[in-house]
Structure formats: C-alpha cells, structure tokens
Amino acid sequence: MSFSRSSMSYSSSGGGGGGGTMSMRSGGGGGMGMGSSRFSSMGGGGGGGGAMRSGSVYGGAGGSGVRISSSSFGSGGGGGGGGYGFGMGGGGGGGGGFGMGGGGGGGGADMNVSANEKATMQNLNDRLSTYLEKVRKLEAANAELELKIRQFMESKTSPSSRDYSAFYAIIADLQDKIQAATRVNGGIYLSIDNAKLAADDFRTKYENELAMRQSVEADIAGLKRMLDEMTMARSDLEMQIEGLKEELIYLKKNHEEELLAMRTQMTGQINVEVDAAPQEDLSRVMAEIREQYESVSAKNQRDLEAWFQTKTETLNKEVASSTEVLQTSKSEISEIRRTLQALEIELQSQQSMKGSLENTLAETEGRYSMQLGRLQNQVTSLEEQLVSLRSDMERQGQEYKMLLDIKTRLEMEIAEYRRLLDGEASGLGASSSKSVQKSSSSGLSSSVSSSTVSSSSSVPSSTTSTTRKVVIVTEEIVDGKVVSTSETKHTT
C-alpha cells in the first residue's frame, strides 16, 4: 500500500506596467512518501508589487518527518509587466521534468498566452509522451521479465515440471524388490515360527519319552531287584533241596543201619514161647513207612520242581519282555536324539539365515533412507528456490503497482495542471493561487482540494482595492478513478 500526499500553491499578482515571474515545482517519492508542488507567480509595476506564498507540506519516505509551512500573501498595484515559468519533477520508477518561461508587458490583471508559452506547452506534451513511452517500455520489460520468470519456473524450479520418468522404473523395481524381500522375510519368519513350534513339540515329546524311559528304567531296576530276589530264593530253595536230599540220605542211612541192626537182632534165634498176641510184620510196616516217606519226598520234590520251573519260566518271560521293551526304548531314544540333533542343526541354520536377512534388510533400509534424505534435501532446496522466486515476483509486483500508482498520480496531477492552465487560458479575471491536497490508498480514497484565488486590480494610483476568492474543490477517488467532484466558492 502506498500513500502519497501532494500540495500545490498558486499565486499571482498583476500590475499596470511591471514585470512578473511564475514558477511551479512538483516532486514525488516512491513507495510510501509525501511530495509537494509549488506554483507561484509574482508581478510588479510602477506603483507597487505583489507576492504570495502558500502553505506546503514536505515529508520523506514512510510519512515521517513532516514539516508544515504557513502561507501568507500580499498584493499591490502598479505598472505592468509579467513573466511565467513552470517546472515539474517526478520520482519513483521514472520521472520527467519540464520548465517554461516568458516575459511580456501589459497593464491589467489578465494573463495572455504567448507563442512562447505554446511552444513550452508543446515541449511539455512531448516530454509527457516520452514519459508515457518510457512507462510503456517499463511495462513491456516487466511483462517480459514475468514471462521469463514464469518460463524459468515451469522449466527449472517447479517440482511438477521436472521429468522423473527415468526414475519411475528404478523406483518400481526397488519397490518390487522391497516387497519381494518383505514376502521372503515373512516366509522366513513363518518358517522360524513353524520350526519353533516343531521344536517345542519335539521337546515335549522328548520330555515325555524321557519320563517314560525313566519309568521303564525304574521298572527294569525293580525287575532286576526282583530277579535278584528270585535268584536268592532259588538258591535258598536249592539249598533247602540239598538239605532235604542230605536229610533223605541221612534218613536212608539211619534206616539201613536200623534195618541192619534189626536184622542182626533178628538173626539170633530165640525160642520164647509166650502167650501174646500175634505181632505185626515189622518188615511190612517198615516197607509201608518207607513207601510213605518216599511218596511224600517224591511229591515234595515234584512240587518244588514244578514251582521252581513255573517261577523260572515266569521270570524268564518277564526278563525277555523287559529286555525287549528296553531295546525298543533305547532305539526310540536314539532316534529321538538324532531327530533333535537334526532339528537343532536346522534351527541354527535358520537363525543364521535370519541374521543375514536382517542385516541385508537393515542395509537396504539404510541405503534407501539415505536416498530418500537426498531426495528430500533436493525437494527442500527446490521449495526454497520456489519461495525465493515467489517473493521476488511479489516484490516486483509491488514495485509494478507502486509504479502504476505513481503513474496514475502523475497523470492526475498533469490533468489538474492542464485544467488549471486551460482555466488560465480561458481568461480568469485575476491572479489566482490554488492548493490541491490529495490522499489515496489501495482501496477507497478521497481527495479534497482547496483553492484560494486572490486578485489585485489596479485602479487609479490613489486607490488600491483587494478582492479574495476562495474555491474549495472536493474529489472522491476510488482505485485511481475520480468518482465525484464538487466545488464551493467564497468571495471575501
């Protein structure tokens, strides 16, 4: 947004036969500044002279350091003569200046436009056309610069305009490789989980088989103890059989000795006649007793042999079955050990493969992260270049708007000057001074111009009269266009 305020003062005085000068100054600043213009005319005659100063406002860029000067005027009458001068300067993106001067003589308050002044106006118009031509050239250069910036942005700096088609195939290939590696990694993880489950299953089976083996070994130990007990019982029975055999032999020996004794006793013939009951036959009784003992001994021997044979067969069967179970358990344990060793070897190979794949995955992720970082840095640098170009474009746009604003204000001031000059050429009756104050902004702006016209007419040298006319011009400007104008006139 730019704000400019200008003031213009105009004063004139005329006499009968003197000379007068008139000058005009105009200044403008770029950006936010305040400029001032001054227009004055002086004339003097034989009897007196006139001079007028009007208030003006000066300020620098930004609207700071404002100094306001007061205005005063005076008039006098006398003989005639006059001169006219005009000057203007402009600052900002471009500027121009012109001046004119002339002299003449006459008696009266009217101002005549001479041929000199027409030439000066022609020069002024030529300079204005030159200034407008420069403005057009600046606009064309600005448009060309904007076109070059736009082309540069479209060709170089815009990320969307860069041709990344050469990288699409590489990116797609890398993405396919990443997906394949991810699938392979997932399959490996699944295989590892399956191997862990199988290892847990085999560990459970191993523990069950180990418990069964321990129970079988405990049974075998119990059977061994039972076998030892049976062996000891067998040896005891054999010892008892041997004892019984020895006792039987001893009994047989005693029986034979008794038989021999009885026989020796029976060999002597004793004839004793007694009246007694008939005696039993001792040999028959002894034979019966012998048969009875022999039958009992044979029966006991048969029973012992049968019991021993039965127990021996039972123990042999149990030992054979236990030995078979033990051999089966040993073969199963050896098979389980071989399976466990194979699974442990496979687990170690899978773990080593997992470690190598994890290292490969980490290296791949690191490499792609580095590439992504480089691409991100490139994108960041391109974004910074884009931001700087946008800021340059905005700055140039603001400068262009400022130049357009200055051009508009200068055209308005030139139009106002032309209107004043046309008003003077149409024959104003008195010298006039006019002050125009304008204020503008980017939106709605209004301008109020106050004109003070003072004239002094020369009557006979003995009498001098002064007439003051005040003209207040109010203009409403929207976006550099005059919307409404109103004038108020006062005469004092």
UniProtKB/Swiss-Prot annotation:
Residues 1-12, 431-470 have a biased composition (Low complexity). Type 1 keratin. May maintain oral mucosal cell homeostasis and tissue organization in response to mechanical stress. GO terms for cellular component: intermediate filament. Residues 171-262 are annotated as: Coil 1B. Residues 13-34 have a biased composition (Gly residues). Residues 1-48, 426-470 are annotated as: Disordered. Residues 1-116 are annotated as: Head. Heterotetramer of two type I and two type II keratins. There are two types of cytoskeletal and microfibrillar keratin: I (acidic; 40-55 kDa) and II (neutral to basic; 56-70 kDa). It comes from the Eukaryota. It comes from Oncorhynchus mykiss (Rainbow trout). Residues 286-424 are annotated as: Coil 2. PROSITE patterns: IF_ROD_2. Residues 425-492 are annotated as: Tail. Keywords: Coiled coil, Intermediate filament, Keratin. Residues 117-428 form the IF rod domain. Belongs to the intermediate filament family. Residues 117-152 are annotated as: Coil 1A. Expressed in epidermis. GO terms for molecular function: structural molecule activity. Gene3D superfamilies: 1.20.5.170, Single helix bin, Vasodilator-stimulated phosphoprotein. GO terms for biological process: regulation of translation in response to stress. This is Keratin, type I cytoskeletal 13. Residues 154-170 are annotated as: Linker 1. Residues 263-285 are annotated as: Linker 12. PANTHER family: INTERMEDIATE FILAMENT, KERATIN 15-RELATED. Transmembrane segments: none annotated.
